[in-house]
Swiss-Prot record:
Domain of life: Bacteria
Described purpose of this protein according to its UniProt entry: Catalyzes the attachment of proline to tRNA(Pro) in a two-step reaction: proline is first activated by ATP to form Pro-AMP and then transferred to the acceptor end of tRNA(Pro). As ProRS can inadvertently accommodate and process non-cognate amino acids such as alanine and cysteine, to avoid such errors it has two additional distinct editing activities against alanine. One activity is designated as 'pretransfer' editing and involves the tRNA(Pro)-independent hydrolysis of activated Ala-AMP.
Entry's free-text remark on domains: Consists of three domains: the N-terminal catalytic domain, the editing domain and the C-terminal anticodon-binding domain.
GO biological process, one term: prolyl-tRNA aminoacylation
InterPro entries associated with the record: aa-tRNA-synt_IIb (IPR002314), aa-tRNA-synth_II (IPR006195), aa-tRNA-synth_II/BPL/LPL (IPR045864), Anticodon-bd (IPR004154), Anticodon-bd_dom_sf (IPR036621), Pro-tRNA-ligase_IIa (IPR002316), Pro-tRNA-synth_IIa_bac-type (IPR004500), Pro-tRNA-Synthase_IIa_type1 (IPR023717)
Record family assignment: Belongs to the class-II aminoacyl-tRNA synthetase family. ProS type 1 subfamily.
PANTHER family found in the cross-reference section: MITOCHONDRIAL RIBOSOME PROTEIN L39/PROLYL-TRNA LIGASE FAMILY MEMBER, PROLINE--TRNA LIGASE
Protein name per its UniProtKB record: Proline--tRNA ligase
One Gene Ontology molecular-function label: transferase activity
Keyword Isomerase found: no
Catalysed reactions listed for this entry: tRNA(Pro) + L-proline + ATP = L-prolyl-tRNA(Pro) + AMP + diphosphate
SUPFAM superfamilies with a match to the protein in the record: Class II aaRS ABD-related, Class II aaRS and biotin synthetases, YbaK/ProRS associated domain
């Protein structure tokens, strides 16, 4: 493919509106362009990468018997009313009317559509299991699109749905998908973890997320590719290294999720779902009487603890939430933070949001900073974290502005239901007791769910079992964020290319090292002087030999300065660069392996053989 015939609009500078490196590079390298807020055009390079990823997916899904199809993106609202999600999905749902004023939506996901199709076609257990998937654009009305392809209003997704007679059968397919996802992301060259996840608006009982790990910005060895003029990192002057560190630190750490994982075992979970080992620390002690004490201007845990000269963990943190329009108190020890997802899941709620101060005054008679669980009116549900039950003679708000109670004791002074509703902390013991929890940022690239009968119950998707009884179909759901993969790959494979000029000056510039299976082309063939006929003839011969051996070749035939060509090549990020320069008359070409920065000159007749040797382990 001739580069002069492709739309690859590279930029000399990073785009000013980009905050994460993947967004900046995919724009600067000419992979995507924003059409409007949260809506992107995938230019030829991005399209080729996405198509290669689709091929990997199809190959792995063929192995587990998944069958591809295509459902409409424009959906009738009646389907979503039938499942109950039309009202509960929230403001992210694109709603529209046709000329007859009938309600439609643009599909953010397709559980209802697939459930209906199977419900209408499948009547007997003998027709199951079914394993269907599609790859298409989805739509969500994001309030604040950001970070390139990570948070958009239109995005490409692979969503699959499986249909079963039993949960045992679902378990088999669920595990097959888990293994397929691991194979797909491994082939795509991603560093990822499969973690315990939250089902969210999808419903269901079990789920696993697949997270691409955001690289550590402090590890220079994994970010820098050194030119052959620089033997090692130790040869770079300290002031240059400090500049490079500052450049790395100037980009936001990508990834909307924090992952908690064990330092010694396979345990890993989204922070929203993560737990740590819990050991009861309750002690037998004499219980003090309740005493109301004035605590002027003390509204935070640390202010109250300092005023009363107690440890922060002895102060009960009281938070008021409105849960499905009813008040719920959540209690924590003072130095812990609430995990709203855990609380919502414990309550089985559709909606959960912090109460306003006005609501707190109307319900409890006091403002924030003075709320507590003692002497409440009947009907207010209290959920306390497990650690609260270990407290004795604690401090809590008195539900009276500027006052707190001392001598507060769970079970004597208030009744609560206990659950794990706290956010874990780095360094705590893993729940499997192997290692301690460590944190990392990650980009969600896949999610699998055991939906169970969530949709078949609400949409009457039943089959007849062996005994002729009508039973609901058991479902699974399996998603991959296809367009997100491009961001995740670039985030992990962005590099700073460092070189040294003949005068001894150090230069560094951003580029991409695409993994072989996802690179839009295998080889970037660059002719330094396109006006040199011998160089042109050699270019055509090399191009033909590469293509004959199955290499996808992007030939830079533009009449541009060689510096611009090399700069664009680093940005675009193909695994191999072959340069035809001053030694074209001798038949000599230069091979450069982008991942390592290594280069070698060989005769054109030995090019294929040399490439086979250089790339056999890559």
């Amino acid at each position: 493919m001739k580069q002069s015939k492709m739309l690859i609009p590279t930029l000399r500078e990073m785009p000013s509106d980009a905050q994460v490196i993947s967004h900046a590079l995919m724009v600067r390298a000419g992979y995507v362009r924003q059409v409007s807020a949260g809506i992107y055009a995938y230019l030829p390079l991005a399209h080729r990468t996405i198509e290669k990823f689709k091929t990997i997916m199809r190959q792995e899904f063929d192995k587990i018997g998944a069958v591809e199809m295509l459902a409409p993106a424009l959906l009738t609202a009646d389907l979503w009313r039938e499942s109950g999600r039309y009202e509960t999905y929230g403001e992210d749902l694109y709603k529209l009317k046709n000329r007859d004023k009938s309600d439609f939506i643009l599909g953010p996901t397709h559980e209802e559509t697939f459930t209906t199709l199977v419900r209408d076609a499948v009547k007997s257990y003998k027709q199951l299991p079914l394993n269907l998937y599609q790859i298409q654009s989805k739509y969500r009305d994001e309030k604040r699109p950001r970070n390139g392809l990570l948070r958009t209003r239109e995005f490409i997704m692979k969503d699959g749905y499986s249909f079963h007679q039993s949960y045992d059968d679902l378990d088999v397919t669920y595990d097959a998908y888990r293994q397929a996802y691991e194979a797909i992301f491994t082939r795509a060259g991603l560093d990822f973890k499969g973690i315990i996840g939250d089902g969210g608006a999808m419903g269901g009982k079990d789920s696993q997320e697949f997270m691409a790990i955001t690289p550590d910005r402090t590890n220079l060895d994994r970010w820098l590719v050194l030119d052959k003029s620089i033997p090692s990192l130790a040869d770079i002057p300290e002031e240059v290294l400090e500049e490079i560190k500052a450049e790395l630190a100037s980009w936001l750490v990508s990834g909307e999720d924090t992952i908690a994982y064990s330092s010694e075992s396979s345990y890993a979970a989204n922070l929203e779902m993560a737990t740590s080992e819990y050991k009861s620390s309750s002690k037998v002690t004499a219980l003090d009487d309740l005493v109301e004490i004035e605590t002027p201007n003390c509204k935070t845990i640390d202010e109250v603890a300092a005023f009363l000269d107690v440890a922060e963990h002895q102060v009960i943190k009281t938070l008021l939430f409105m849960v499905d329009h009813e008040p719920v108190l959540a209690l924590l020890v003072g130095n812990d933070q609430i995990n709203a997802v855990k609380l919502k899941n414990h309550l089985g709620a559709d909606f959960l949001e912090p109460a306003s101060e006005e609501e707190a005054r109307a319900i409890l008679g006091a403002g924030f900073g003075s709320l507590g669980p003692v002497h409440l009116t009947d009907g207010i549900r209290i959920v306390a974290d497990r650690k609260v039950q270990d407290l004795a003679n604690a401090v809590a708000g008195a539900n009276k502005d500027g006052y707190h109670l001392t001598g507060v004791n769970p079970n004597r002074d208030f009744q609560a239901e206990y659950a794990d509703i706290r956010e874990v902390k780095e360094g705590e013991t893993s729940p499997d007791r192997h290692g301690v929890l460590q944190f990392a940022r990650g980009i969600e690239i896949g999610h699998i769910f055991k939906l169970g009968t969530r949709y078949s119950d609400s949409m009457a998707a039943n089959i007849l079992d062996e005994n002729g009884r009508a039973v609901p179909i058991v479902m699974g759901c399996y998603g991959i964020g296809v367009s997100r993969i491009l961001s995740a790959v670039i985030e992990q494979h962005a590099r700073l290319f460092v070189s040294k000029t003949p005068k001894g000056d150090y230069r560094y510039a951003w580029g991409i090292n695409f993994p072989k299976e996802l690179a839009p082309f295998d080889v970037h063939l660059i002719t330094v002087n396109v006006k040199d006929q011998e160089a042109q003839d050699l270019t055509e011969r090399v191009e033909a030999s590469l293509m004959a051996k199955g290499y996808d070749v992007l030939t830079d035939d533009r009449n541009e300065r060689v510096g611009s060509k090399f700069s664009d090549s680093d940005l675009i990020g193909l695994p191999i660069r072959v340069t035809i320069g001053k030694k074209a008359a001798e038949g000599i070409v230069e091979i450069k392996i982008k991942a390592t920065g290594d280069s070698i000159e060989v005769h054109a007749d030995s090019l294929i053989e040399t490439l086979d040797i250089l790339t056999k382990d890559n």
